[in-house]
Amino acid sequence: MITNRSHDLLTRARPSGLWGRLAQFPLVRILIVVLFLVPEAMFHNLTIVHIVEKMPHPWFTVLLDVVSILDVALVVFLYSRYTRWIEKRPAVEFGLRGAGREFGAGALISVLLVGMAWGAIVIGGSYRVLGVAHPWILLHAAIRFGTGAFLQVMIFRVILFRLTDELIGTYAALALAAMIFGLAHAINGNLTASGLAGLIVGDVLLVAAFALTRRVWFVWGMHAAWNFCQDGVLGMPNSGVTELPSWLEVEVEGPWWLTGGEFGIEASVTATALSILVGVGILQRARARGQVLRPVWKRVVELPDPLVE
């Protein structure tokens, strides 16, 4: 597996003056990168309101998928501009060497985790298939969950975790990012205590995956495959969202600790326990590879020279 060193993602800028130093403070850079991404949000909202929503089916679905893919491309471009202009470094998070293998490895882990949690539900007699949709829906689901997962990886791991990691260290940043990720999903509805715990534990797993490689591919594959399998294929709620179309039409009835209830598999005891085991394992591997940063006040690092335009 290809990995960046944790220090490869630190800013290389050498600011002079008060405003220059202030702009390089990690929490300020979170605001700056958000401003860089504003054009993507404007593009998305304008195209959805003025073009996509006016289209009949099936063109509505096709154009929605196209816009989602363009969203990802635009985020990659804008974030790359941010790292080059503000942090004076290349966006090594998007390095393509070994990308397919990393994405596949992350996806395989999630397929196995969801498969084991789903298997427990089936064995418990709580899962019944009522119907099967056209296979075409799987392509739409792959695009929907793939692009959605990428954007969440960018927001919660590449931006929020990475920049707070640079300031307060990996462990504290991991806890903060996981808590914010869990609370951010409260707007989905159907949030329970077990659902919140499952989300926090799940994000610990995902943040650990990013901390290990310091690239988007491994964690993206893990996040996308989890949502795709849970909702797009198996027809179960995804983080409290129940109205999305799925390949399988199913009925799930059973205790919350087994099924996760209306929130989804991630709220089940099985999925939470498995995520803890795998997340701790990945985090230990990241530590063994020297990918865990200490807080800024406890480390001294010699950074490479900044990029010269």
Can you say where each PLM-predicted feature lies in the sequence?
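Residues that define the loop-to-transmembrane-helix transition and helix capping
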Residues: 171-172, 214-217, 266
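Function-critical hydrophobic alpha-helical transmembrane segments in multi-pass membrane proteins
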Residues: 77, 130-191, 201, 208
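Mid-bilayer segments of alpha-helical transmembrane spans in multi-pass integral membrane proteins
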Residues: 107-119, 145-146, 150, 232
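Functionally important transmembrane alpha-helices
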Residues: 195-257
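Aromatic-anchored segments of alpha-helical transmembrane domains
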Residues: 37-42, 114-120, 178-187, 224-233
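Transmembrane alpha-helix boundary signature
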Residues: 85-88, 114-130
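N-terminal, membrane-interfacial amphipathic/helix-forming hydrophobic leader that caps
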Residues: 1-90, 231-309
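Hydrophobic residues within alpha-helical transmembrane segments
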Residues: 100, 108, 143, 147, ...
